[in-house]
Amino acid sequence: MNYAIDKFTGTLILAARATKYAQYVCPVCKKGVNLRKGKVIPPYFAHLPGHGTSDCENFVPGNSIIIETIKTISKRYMDLRLLIPVGSNSREWSLELVLPTCNLCRAKITLDVGGRSQTLDMRSMVKSRQIGAELSVKSYRIVSYSGEPDPKFVTEVERECPGLPSEGAAVFTALGRGASKGFPRAQELRCTETFAFLWRHPVAPDFPDELEIKSLASKQGWNLALVTIPEVPSVESISWLKSFTYLPVVPARTSITAIWPFLNQKTSINHVECVHSDTILLSANMAPTSSENVGPTMYAQGSSLLLSAVGVEKSPAFFILNPGENDFVGVSGSIEQDVNLFFSFYKKNVSVPRKYPSIDLVFTKRNKEKTIVSLHQRRCIEVMMEARMFGHKLEYMSMPSGVEGVARIQRQTESSVIKLVSNDDIAAHDKSMRLLSPVALSQLSDCLANLTCHVEIDFLGLGKIFLPSSSMLSLDDGEFIELSPNLRSRILSFILQMGHTLHGFSLNNDFLLVEKLVDLQPEPHLLPHYRALVKEVKTNGFECNRFR
């Protein structure tokens, strides 16, 4: 601006005749201004930092030269967060309001925190300040200031923070919490992640079965639950989540994880320090693919060589990395180069296993002959089903030190889970392996011997197998029924064409494939093809009353 009012004389002064030793105010908004001039720029007046707003027609920011367009002042907001104590005190959850920081000033601020008024000294807000908030559908807001508040705080901070929804759920996430305590409001629902749902109506929502729900104690008519979204939710679940939370559902983040060796630690977001090993097992989750029929392509960059490999499965896709003599290796996806993992290796005095880490099962036949099979091998299902039918004894199970798995047992009337962990005993066939604890081995042996039990053994990336009960088998002279390769491919193609995913599925297990076929609900125009497949499945010896 070219003119300003001298604060002491009250006269209008031209910028070219003003002196830097006097004090001036804007003739329009009466806020403080100062004289700006230089060797090239002609003299002009500009508002002091923190004084005046863009509402003033003469407003010129004090930290810039004369410009035609005034930038919009960036707003800061109060943040509503959810506090959930760890452990048994989780029923004492509460809400808090996080206030933006302000410059030191002698003033007080009065806030409405959900029907309750609270006054704070703004000198306590130089650092981040949190105050308790009530459960309310009304907005949390700044009511008034008293004294001389920080002008920048008054200008930049939005006076209202949205309250809780009257219908549906407010969603809080543990990601992006920063230095403040508590969980902030979520802006989207990302697959594979866990969120806190807080709602009042409806009292008992009909959560889809594929969501993992952990309910917490209710308070003042409000319900709270921790909800975990699966990696690939169904269309029905996505629609339900959108209608209940009014938030979009987005795919899981692409990630690369080091599964083996266990002696590794993350030193930063994408840097892993790892004991030097000839075998490193990696898992690529939700990595992009170039084709629907293949898994993701991964690159490994050493000191002088770039290698690539294509995964068999889509997600998770498993890769084996041999670092050779490299002390530093980078691994990344072929499409999304931002997703990468860097390995640095260190030597360890103890010997490192040279073989692929595996879960081994040792069975003893009636003639005392021993059979050793690894859980990830194709013939494992055949060996274990033969052992169940002919009463072969499970001598022991061995695994790398530190590995944990589970055995899920489904009986006719109940189900149970056996935790499979190793002890310090060394396996007879491999000194680098440790034996399953005797208690877990005894329980697992009993379940394998009981032909009425469904048994599923799951060690994640090291192997997974499902053994059906005898009611699902049709045996003739000791031979096991199986699908022909042609029929197996046709069933698999039919399932995939209907848009179904096959999580945890193994090409070695025909029973899971048939069970997946049984659960399908094909459209009317697909029923003839479906019935033809069912007929051929029955011809192969599989029996199931649920077939149409």
UniProtKB/Swiss-Prot annotation:
<comment type="function">
    <text>Component of antiviral defense system Druantia type I, composed of DruA, DruB, DruC, DruD and DruE. Expression of Druantia in E.coli (strain MG1655) confers resistance to phage lambda, SECphi18, SECphi27 and T4.</text>
</comment>
<dbReference type="GO" id="GO:0051607">
    <property type="term" value="P:defense response to virus"/>
</dbReference>
<dbReference type="Pfam" id="PF25164">
    <property type="entry name" value="CoiA_N"/>
</dbReference>
<dbReference type="GO" id="GO:0005737">
    <property type="term" value="C:cytoplasm"/>
</dbReference>
<protein>
    <recommendedName>
        <fullName>Druantia protein DruB</fullName>
    </recommendedName>
</protein>
<keyword id="KW-0963">Cytoplasm</keyword>
<keyword id="KW-0051">Antiviral defense</keyword>
